[in-house]
Amino acid sequence: MSSVFSKPNLKRPSFDVKNLTKPSRLLSATLRSSCAFLSSASFFACSLCFFCCSSISFCSLASSSARLRYSSSHSFFCWVLFSRSGLAYSSSNLSSKSSRLRS
């Protein structure tokens, strides 16, 4: 009677990292590290692009305003924004704006 209700003792094959061969473990580790690198690089690229686009749009919006067009604070603020993103205003542009402000 007990043999009817007993389950057969079959071992299921299990997936274990230790059972993998050495090259496939190396490949999986390489894939994991490259995916992590690509995700962090894409996040950095997207955040840099967003920062550049937002600073360009702010500076163009501020320079289209007649009130802020020749102000030195606007030039300085745009220079700070662009220098942080690697696209600094040229010094000639700043000096021409400051000379217009003085005259």
From Swiss-Prot:
Protein's name in the database: Uncharacterized protein MPN_040
Organism listed in the record: Mycoplasma pneumoniae (strain ATCC 29342 / M129 / Subtype 1)
